[in-house]
């Protein structure tokens, strides 16, 4: 599950 | 980074450049929905607020800057520079019906109840429906210029490629983001009708016309 705030996609 | 995500970003960048050039060269924004472009400017603004605080890579930062700058430039051309050519009578989609539900949903369904995260979530939800005013305008005018259909195709393909990127990342990186995936699926489904028309008509040299 993605951690909040670490969105590495555009 | 994987090939699907890279091709997706290139397709997205191409769509943005195609639109910018179409309006700038023809000095006209006929057939272009200013509302959709406004929504895209909101999408990029709310999604890239961490532009200066969260450095991921040169590629990531430079693409974000290009996306934000070009979306504002496009809105400026439509509502200011070439506003005489803006076809407001056919650009009548009620954007509040897109902004309010996505804003509410971003408060209810998100990864973390913090301002940045809620704004990021809002931008993901809004992006999935931001093209509706444009598709509505094409259906209302009953046709679209060929360059506009190429713009829409590139824009639609970008999120379709991102779906493959998420499959790839789930498979090889144990990464998945359900919010982005569900919104990406909705976004891609909205283009299906257009994809069918584009492939059956525009690629055969015909003009894109919708049964009015």
From Swiss-Prot, chain B:
**A Gene Ontology CC term for this entry?**
endoplasmic reticulum-Golgi intermediate compartment membrane
Topological domains on the Cytoplasmic side lie at 25-32, 80-92, 136-149, 200-212
Keyword tags? Cytoplasmic vesicle, Endoplasmic reticulum, ER-Golgi transport, Golgi apparatus, Membrane, Protein transport, Receptor, Transmembrane, Transmembrane helix, Transport
Q: Which residue ranges run through the membrane?
A: 5-24, 33-52, 59-79, 93-110, 117-135, 150-168, 179-199
| Lineage: superkingdom | Eukaryota
The record's annotation in InterPro entries points to: ER_ret_rcpt (IPR000133)
Q: List site positions: Interaction with the K-D-E-L motif on target proteins.
A: 5, 117
**Residues at site: Important for recycling of cargo proteins with the sequence motif K-D-E-L from the Golgi to the endoplasmic reticulum?**
193
Q: Where in the cell is it found?
A: Golgi apparatus membrane; Cytoplasmic vesicle, COPI-coated vesicle membrane; Endoplasmic reticulum membrane; Endoplasmic reticulum-Golgi intermediate compartment membrane
Q: Name one GO molecular function term.
A: KDEL sequence binding
GO BP term, example: protein retention in ER lumen
Q: Where is this region: Important for recycling of cargo proteins with the sequence motif K-D-E-L from the Golgi to the endoplasmic reticulum?
A: 204-207
- Topology of the protein relative to the lipid bilayer: Multi-pass membrane protein
Q: Where is this region: Interaction with the K-D-E-L motif on target proteins?
A: 47-48, 159-169
Q: Name one Pfam family in it.
A: ER_lumen_recept
Disulfide feature: none
Give residue spans on the Lumenal membrane side. 1-4, 53-58, 111-116, 169-178
Q: Which family does it belong to?
A: Belongs to the ERD2 family.
Q: What is this protein's function per UniProt?
A: Receptor for the C-terminal sequence motif K-D-E-L that is present on endoplasmic reticulum resident proteins and that mediates their recycling from the Golgi back to the endoplasmic reticulum.
Protein name, entry field:
ER lumen protein-retaining receptor 1-B
